[in-house]
C-alpha cells in the first residue's frame, strides 16, 4: 500500500468510531415444494450463502438428490459488523451434471432484524408467484474480539484493514522436477485486494495481502508445474491452508509447504495492522480547499458587483451572492458558443461576478482549454478564440495520418505500462486532442488549481455519469461524478479523491497502487464520450418523445414514494426481493442491447468500501438515489472493480447537479443551452428531475409564445421556494441578431448576410457530428452567442440586484443581534 503525498486530502469530517463485531450463525434447515428443470427426475438441490459485507466468503450446503423437500440442517458462521448494511443472499440451485446448474430461487435478507441472543426462525416463500419455501434459523452472538475502528460519513464505511506479509524461502529447496520443469507457488487470499499471487521456486520472494481485519478468511496455497499448467501431484501434495484470525498482529510465524517433491520450502507469515488514514475523502460538505477558494473568490466578486451595479459601499463576505454558469453539451457547437458567451460577460464586466462554472460534453472542451492559463478570465478572450477558430477550421485528415496513428499507439502503450486500463475511449482522447490542439497538451486537472490560487477565476466543475457496464440502460442506473481541480467523486456517496489519484487503485479507502494522473485530454474523452451509448439508449433516443421522458421521471418518483429507500426493522422489501432468472436467450438479448463495448474503464476508488446500516435514509444519498438497485448494497458501485464513465448528456443535457452540493447554495444561475431544437426541453427535464429529489429548482414555465419564438434570455424563478436560485436561460436562438450587429445597432443592407446563422436548416453546419467549421460559420456562431448575452445585459443586472437583495436580507439579522 502506498503512502499519501504531502498534498493528499485533508482530514475527514467524520472521526473514527469503534464498533463491536458479532458472530452470525445461519442454519439452513429445509426447503419445500421445489420445482425442478429436469423432466426425468426431481431436483438435486443445494444452497449457496453469501454475505455482501464478507468478501470472498461463500458457503455451500451438501447436495441432496431427487427431492423436492430437502432437509439440510447445516450451520454456517459469519463475522459481521453491525454498523454496515449486512444483506444475506440465499440461493437454491438444482445441480446438473451435464449443463449449468439451474437456480430455483434467490432471496436477499437484511439481517438487521436479527436481535442479539435471540434465535430467529424465518420462512422465505416465493408467493404469490410460487409455492417454494425455505426455512432458515438465525442467531446473533457477541464476540470477545476487540472493537473494530471504522471511518464513516453515514453512507460509506471504511473498515479496518490488516496486511499479511508472506516471505517465500525456497533457496534451500531440492525440488525434484522432470525435464527442467519449474514449480510455481500460488497463494490465494479470498476477499483481499490482491486475491491471488504467484512465484516460482528457487528465489526468495515476498508478497503482501491487504484484507479486512474482521474477516473469517484463510490463506491457501498450492504448488503446480509450469509445463503442465496443472496442480503438482495429488490433491493434498503441496497444498496448505492458514486461517488468519488466530495470527497475532506483529508476530512472525514460519511454516513448511507440504510438498514431497520440493522439501525445504518455507513460508514466513506476519500480520500487521494497516494505517487508518484514508486516501478517499468521506464527507458531503465542501473540501477545505474549496471553502478557502470561496473566501478568496468572494472578494473578487464583491469588487466586480460594486462596479457593475454601481453600489455606494463595499459588500461584506456574507452578502455576496453566489452566481454560477451552467453550460450544456453539444460538441463543437457548444465549445464555440460558450466562447461567445464568456466573451460577452467579459465585455460587460460580469465575468468576475461568477463563482462556479459547470459544464458537460462539448462545453468542457472550452473549459479545459481556458483553465490551462491561470489568468484566463483576466486576459482578452480573443486570444483563445483565435486558437479555437484555427483548429476547428483546419482539415482533420492529418488527425488520421500514419504518423499520428503511430504516435497514438505509442501513447496508449505508455499508458498501459503505467497501469492505466486502455480502451477505445483513450484513442478517442488522443484523436480529440489532435483535433482541438494539433499537439500534445501536457496539462492535468490538478494543474488547474493555479487558476484558483487567488480566486481570480470561477471554480470549474466537470460532470460525468457512472453507469452499469452491462445489463442496464443509462435511464435506469446512473450516478453523478463530479471533477474539479480539488477533487473527483460521487455526489451520491460523499466520497472523493484528489485528481492526482484518479485512475489509481484503491481498496477500503486506502491507496494500493499509485498510477500517474492522466492528461486532461483523457478526462475530456470521458466527459464527451460519444462512443458509450448502448443500443437500448440509442433505441430510446430514436423512439421516445419528450412526454415519455417526463413519464419516466414521474414513474421513478412514484416508485420512490411507494417504496421508500428507508428500511424498517422488518426489512420486508429486501425479504421480498426474489430475483427470477430469465432464459439464456432473454439474458443474451438483454446483454446485446445494454452492453457498452466502447465504454471507458477506470479503477474504482470506492472498491471495498461498504454501505452504512442506515445509508438508505441518509438525506444526501436519497437525494441522488433513483433505482431499485439503490436498496441492494451488493449491486452498488463499491462492489465494482471498475467505473464505467460516460457523457452526462446521455441522461439530461445539463450540468446542474454540481450546483446543488451542500455548501454551494447558488443565488443565480446563468443557463447556457446549446441545443439546436427544443430550447427549453433540457431545462424542463432538469426541473422535473430536481423536484423529484427535493432539490430547490425554479419553475420552468415558458409561455406558448416563448415556446414558439424563444427570445435571447428568459428568467425563471419560484417565489414560493426562496431556496431556489434565480435562473436566466440563454437558448441558442437567432432572434434580433438577424437585424442587429450589436445591441441597439440596426444592420445595414450590406451587413444582413452576417446575421444569417443557419441553426435548423438541412445544411446546418453546427450538427453534433461536425468537427470542422468554415471560418465564417465559426465567426457567425461566436458573434451570435456574444450578441445574445450582451443584448440581455439589463436582465442580467436586474437578476444580480435581486440575488444581492436576497443575500443582504439573509445576512442582516445576525448582525442586527450583535
Swiss-Prot record:
Entry's EC annotation: 3.1.1.4
Catalysed transformations (reactions): a 1,2-diacyl-sn-glycero-3-phosphocholine + H2O = a 1-acyl-sn-glycero-3-phosphocholine + a fatty acid + H(+); 1-hexadecanoyl-2-(5Z,8Z,11Z,14Z-eicosatetraenoyl)-sn-glycero-3-phosphocholine + H2O = 1-hexadecanoyl-sn-glycero-3-phosphocholine + (5Z,8Z,11Z,14Z)-eicosatetraenoate + H(+); 1-hexadecanoyl-2-(9Z,12Z-octadecadienoyl)-sn-glycero-3-phosphocholine + H2O = (9Z,12Z)-octadecadienoate + 1-hexadecanoyl-sn-glycero-3-phosphocholine + H(+); 1-hexadecanoyl-2-(9Z-octadecenoyl)-sn-glycero-3-phosphocholine + H2O = 1-hexadecanoyl-sn-glycero-3-phosphocholine + (9Z)-octadecenoate + H(+)
Membrane topology: Peripheral membrane protein
GO cellular component, one term: membrane
Principal location listed in the UniProt entry: cytoplasm
C2 domain location: 5-124
GO biological process: fatty acid metabolic process; glycerophospholipid catabolic process; phosphatidylglycerol acyl-chain remodeling; phosphatidylinositol acyl-chain remodeling
Residue positions binding Ca(2+) 1: 38, 44, 94, 96
UniProt note on regulation of activity: Stimulated by cytosolic Ca(2+).
MF terms in GO: calcium ion binding; calcium-dependent phospholipase A2 activity; calcium-dependent phospholipid binding; phospholipase A1 activity
Tissue: Expressed in stratified squamous epithelia, such as those in skin and cervix, but not in other tissues. Strongly expressed in the upper spinous layer of the psoriatic epidermis, expressed weakly and discontinuously in atopic dermatitis and mycosis fungoides, and not detected in the epidermis of normal skin.
Pfam families: C2, cPLA2_C2, PLA2_B
Residue ranges of domain PLA2c in the record: 273-818
Cofactor: Ca(2+)
Superkingdom of origin: Eukaryota
Cell compartments where the protein resides: Cytoplasm, Cytosol; Membrane
Binding site for substrate: 330-331
Keywords: Calcium, Cytoplasm, Hydrolase, Lipid degradation, Lipid metabolism, Membrane, Metal-binding
Active site per the UniProt annotation: 361 (nucleophile), 647 (proton acceptor)
Amino acids binding Ca(2+) 2: 38, 94, 96, 102
Pathway: Lipid metabolism; fatty acid metabolism
Comment field on protein domains: The N-terminal C2 domain mediates the association with lipid membranes upon calcium binding. An additional second C2 domain may stand in between the C2 domain and the PLA2c domain.
Function field: Calcium-dependent phospholipase A2 that selectively hydrolyzes glycerophospholipids in the sn-2 position. Has a preference for linoleic acid at the sn-2 position.
Protein name stated in the entry: Cytosolic phospholipase A2 delta
Amino acid at each position: 500500500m502506498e503512502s499519501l503525498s504531502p498534498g493528499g486530502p485533508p482530514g475527514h469530517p467524520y472521526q473514527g468510531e469503534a464498533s463491536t463485531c458479532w458472530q452470525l450463525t445461519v442454519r439452513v434447515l429445509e426447503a419445500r415444494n421445489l420445482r425442478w428443470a429436469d423432466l426425468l427426475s426431481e431436483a438435486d438441490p443445494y444452497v449457496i450463502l453469501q454475505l455482501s459485507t464478507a468478501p470472498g466468503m461463500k458457503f455451500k450446503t451438501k447436495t441432496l438428490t431427487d427431492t423436492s423437500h430437502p432437509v439440510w440442517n447445516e450451520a454456517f458462521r459469519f463475522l459481521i459488523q453491525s454498523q454496515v448494511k449486512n444483506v444475506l443472499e440465499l440461493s437454491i440451485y438444482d445441480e446438473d451434471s451435464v449443463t449449468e446448474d439451474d437456480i430455483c430461487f434467490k432471496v436477499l435478507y437484511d439481517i438487521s432484524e436479527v436481535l442479539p441472543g435471540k434465535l430467529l426462525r424465518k420462512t422465505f416463500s416465493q408467493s404469490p408467484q410460487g409455492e417454494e419455501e425455505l426455512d432458515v434459523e438465525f442467531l446473533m452472538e457477541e464476540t470477545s474480539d476487540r472493537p473494530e475502528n471504522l471511518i464513516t460519513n453515514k453512507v460509506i464505511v471504511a473498515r479496518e484493514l490488516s496486511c499479511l506479509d508472506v516471505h517465500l524461502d525456497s533457496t534451500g529447496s531440492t525440488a525434484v522436477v522432470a525435464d527442467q520443469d519449474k514449480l510455481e507457488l500460488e497463494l490465494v487470499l479470498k476477499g483481499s485486494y490482491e486475491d491471488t499471487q504467484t512465484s516460482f521456486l528457487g528465489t526468495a520472494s515476498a508478497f503482501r495481502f491487504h484484507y479486512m481485519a474482521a474477516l473469517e478468511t484463510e490463506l491457501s496455497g498450492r504448488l503446480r508445474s509450469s509445463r503442465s499448467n496443472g496442480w503438482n501431484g495429488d490433491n493434498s501434495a503441496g497444498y496448505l491452508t492458514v486461517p488468519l484470525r488466530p495470527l497475532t498482529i506483529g508476530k512472525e510465524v514460519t511454516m513448511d509447504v507440504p510438498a514431497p517433491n520440493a522439501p525445504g520450502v518455507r513460508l514466513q507469515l506476519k500480520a500487521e495492522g494497516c494505517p487508518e488514514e484514508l486516501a478517499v475523502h468521506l464527507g458531503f460538505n465542501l473540501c477545505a480547499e474549496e471553502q478557502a477558494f470561496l473566501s478568496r473568490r468572494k472578494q473578487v466578486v464583491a469588487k466586480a458587483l460594486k462596479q457593475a451595479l454601481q453600489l455606494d459601499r463595499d459588500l461584506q463576505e456574507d452578502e455576496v451572492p453566489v452566481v454560477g454558469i451552467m453550460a450544456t453539451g453539444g460538441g463543437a457547437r457548444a465549445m464555440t458558443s460558450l466562447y461567445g458567451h464568456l466573451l460577452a460577460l467579459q465585455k460587460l464586466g460580469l465575468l468576475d461576478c461568477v463563482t462556479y462554472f459547470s459544464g458537460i460534453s462539448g462545453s468542457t472542451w472550452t473549459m479545459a482549454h481556458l483553465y490551462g492559463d491561470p489568468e484566463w478570465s483576466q486576459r482578452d478572450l480573443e486570444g483563445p478564440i483565435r486558437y479555437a477558430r484555427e483548429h476547428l477550421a483546419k482539415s482533420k485528415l492529418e488527425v488520421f495520418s500514419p504518423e499520428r496513428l503511430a504516435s497514438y499507439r505509442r501513447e496508449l502503450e505508455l499508458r498501459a505500462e503505467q497501469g492505466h486500463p486502455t480502451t477505445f475511449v483513450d484513442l478517442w482522447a488522443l484523436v480529440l486532442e489532435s483535433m482541438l490542439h494539433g499537439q500534445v497538451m501536457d496539462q492535468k486537472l490538478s494543474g488547474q488549481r493555479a487558476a484558483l490560487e487567488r480566486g481570480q477565476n470561477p471554480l470549474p466543475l466537470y460532470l460525468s455519469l457512472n453507469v452499469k457496464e452491462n445489463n442496464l440502460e443509462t435511464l435506469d442506473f446512473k450516478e453523478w461524478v463530479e471533477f474539479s481541480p480539488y477533487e473527483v467523486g460521487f455526489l451520491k456517496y460523499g466520497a472523493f479523491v484528489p485528481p492526482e489519484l484518479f485512475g489509481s487503485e484503491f481498496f477500503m479507502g486506502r491507496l494500493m497502487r499509485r498510477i500517474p494522473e492522466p492528461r486532461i485530454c483523457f478526462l475530456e474523452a470521458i466527459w464527451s464520450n460519444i462512443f458509450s451509448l448502448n443500443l437500448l439508449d440509442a433505441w430510446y433516443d430514436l423512439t421516445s418523445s419528450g412526454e415519455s421522458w417526463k413519464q419516466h421521471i414521474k414513474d421513478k418518483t412514484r416508485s420512490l414514494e411507494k417504496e421508500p429507500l428507508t428500511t424498517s426493522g422488518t426489512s420486508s422489501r429486501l425479504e421480498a426481493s426474489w430475483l427470477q432468472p430469465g432464459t439464456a436467450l432473454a439474458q443474451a438479448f438483454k446483454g446485446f442491447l445494454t452492453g457498452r463495448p466502447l465504454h471507458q474503464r477506470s479503477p474504482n476508488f470506492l472498491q471495498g468500501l461498504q454501505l452504512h446500516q442506515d445509508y438508505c435514509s441518509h438525506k444526501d444519498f436519497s437525494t441522488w438515489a433513483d433505482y431499485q438497485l439503490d436498496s441492494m448494497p451488493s449491486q452498488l458501485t463499491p462492489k465494482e472493480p471498475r467505473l464505467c464513465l460516460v457523457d452526462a448528456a446521455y441522461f439530461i443535457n445539463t450540468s446542474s447537479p454540481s450546483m446543488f452540493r451542500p455548501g454551494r447554495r447558488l443565488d443565480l444561475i446563468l443557463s447556457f443551452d446549446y441545443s439546436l431544437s427544443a430550447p427549453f426541453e433540457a431545462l424542463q427535464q432538469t426541473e422535473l428531475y430536481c423536484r423529484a429529489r427535493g432539490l430547490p429548482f425554479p419553475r420552468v414555465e415558458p409561455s406558448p409564445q416563448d415556446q414558439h419564438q424563444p427570445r435571447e434570455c428568459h428568467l425563471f424563478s419560484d417565489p414560493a421556494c426562496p431556496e431556489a436560485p434565480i435562473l436566466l436561460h440563454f437558448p441558442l436562438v437567432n432572434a434580433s441578431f438577424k437585424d442587429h450587429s450589436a445591441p441597439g445597432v440596426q444592420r445595414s443592407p450590406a451587413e444582413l448576410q452576417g446575421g444569417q446563422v443557419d441553426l435548423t436548416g438541412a445544411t446546418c453546419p453546427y450538427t453534433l457530428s461536425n468537427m470542422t467549421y468554415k471560418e465564417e460559420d465559426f465567426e457567425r456562431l461566436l458573434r451570435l452567442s456574444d450578441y445574445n448575452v450582451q443584448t440581455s445585459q439589463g436582465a442580467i443586472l436586474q437578476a444580480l440586484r435581486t440575488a444581492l437583495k436576497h443575500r443582504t436580507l439573509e445576512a442582516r439579522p445576525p448582525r442586527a443581534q450583535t
